[in-house]
Curated annotation (Swiss-Prot):
GO cellular component annotations of the record: plasma membrane
Keyword Secreted: no
Keywords for the protein's UniProt record, in alphabetical order: Cell membrane, Chromophore, Ion transport, Membrane, Photoreceptor protein, Receptor, Retinal protein, Sensory transduction, Transmembrane, Transmembrane helix, Transport
Described purpose of this protein according to its UniProt entry: Light-driven anion pump. Binding affinity for the anions is in the order, bromide > chloride > nitrate > azide > bromate and binding is pH dependent.
Subcellular location per the Swiss-Prot or TrEMBL entry: Cell membrane
Source species: Natronomonas pharaonis (Natronobacterium pharaonis)
Family: Belongs to the archaeal/bacterial/fungal opsin family.
Stated name of the protein: Halorhodopsin
Length: 291
């Protein structure tokens, strides 16, 4: 018995046929606010990579080097991600479900009106790769153990993936917000580890002063992301796509590049404070355990 698929709607056919990367690329270029939010970040990420590599060139301790590498990877991921957005590779046009504030919206692409809103889903890929690096650097600075690091990083990735699901779900308005709630629940786990567990570890490790500064910066900035999501085109659509993109880009600038500079500046001046074992593995200079 042959099972037939439901007919494809005319709008779906038009969307598949008309929306190309080239049109999305030109859409970005033709919106100064949107374009600046992406290209400025590409430039800042590139400059940050060069600066951070120069700053950390003299590090010798394995733990300090691991913190440095994980921190430098943040702008490395960002420059690739923002290039994907600027090129139209990681942007789509999605029709919002019934009940969504942007239901029935359309966008001009290639001189024609296309049903849907522009969704910059590539940002979620960025966060899924860059935020674990931020947490790895923070956890190592705090002198945390492998269990807490694993917990924070895995829940962080879950937060990003479920956030992506919330952005891409078009079957139900309610399901979008359900995914959003799951993402926020995962975020609460990350916040607990940052604010409670790692704060205690950092105090014992002697890095509490810098950790607390970076912790507060990270928590305040990261709390801004779900707020921008809720207010932007993916949530209640109060903010247009250009403003939404700049909201995310501003948060990225502070939560990534400024965060990384502060951490690496501290690291290069206090290498002996963070030196020692990596995770739970004793360093080569450590005293072996008794048999």
């Amino acid at each position: 018995m042959t099972e037939t698929l439901p007919p494809v709607t005319e709008s779906a056919v038009a969307l598949q046929a008309e929306v190309t990367q080239r049109e999305l690329f030109e859409f970005v270029l033709n919106d100064p606010l949107l374009a600046s939010s992406l290209y400025i970040n590409i430039a800042l990420a590139g400059l940050s990579i060069l600066l951070f590599v120069f700053m950390t060139r003299g590090l010798d301790d394995p733990r300090a080097k691991l913190i440095a590498v994980s921190t430098i990877l943040v702008p490395v991921v960002s420059i690739a991600s923002y290039t994907g957005l600027a090129s139209g590779l990681t942007i789509s046009v999605l029709e919002m479900p019934a009940g969504h504030f942007a239901e029935g919206s359309s966008v001009m692409l290639g001189g024609e009106e296309v049903d849907g809103v522009v969704t910059m889903w590539g940002r979620y890929l960025t966060w899924a790769l860059s935020t674990p690096m931020i947490l790895l650097a923070l956890g190592l600075l705090a002198g945390s153990n492998a269990t807490k690091l694993f917990t924070a990083i895995t829940f962080d990735i879950a937060m990003c993936v479920t956030g992506l699901a919330a952005a891409l779900t078009t079957s139900s308005h309610l399901m979008r917000w359900f995914w959003y709630a799951i993402s926020c629940a995962c975020f609460l786990v990350v916040l607990y580890i940052l604010l409670v567990e790692w704060a205690q570890d950092a105090k014992a490790a002697g890095t509490a002063d810098m950790f607390n500064t970076l912790k507060l910066l990270t928590v305040v900035m990261w709390l801004g992301y779900p707020i921008v999501w809720a207010l932007g085109v993916e949530g209640i659509a109060v903010l247009p796509v250009g403003v939404t993109s700049w909201g995310y880009s501003f948060l990225d600038i502070v939560a990534k590049y400024i965060f990384a500079f502060l951490l690496l500046n501290y690291l290069t001046s206090n290498e002996s404070v963070v030196s020692g074992s990596i995770l739970d593995v004793p360093s080569a200079s450590g005293t072996p355990a008794d048999d």
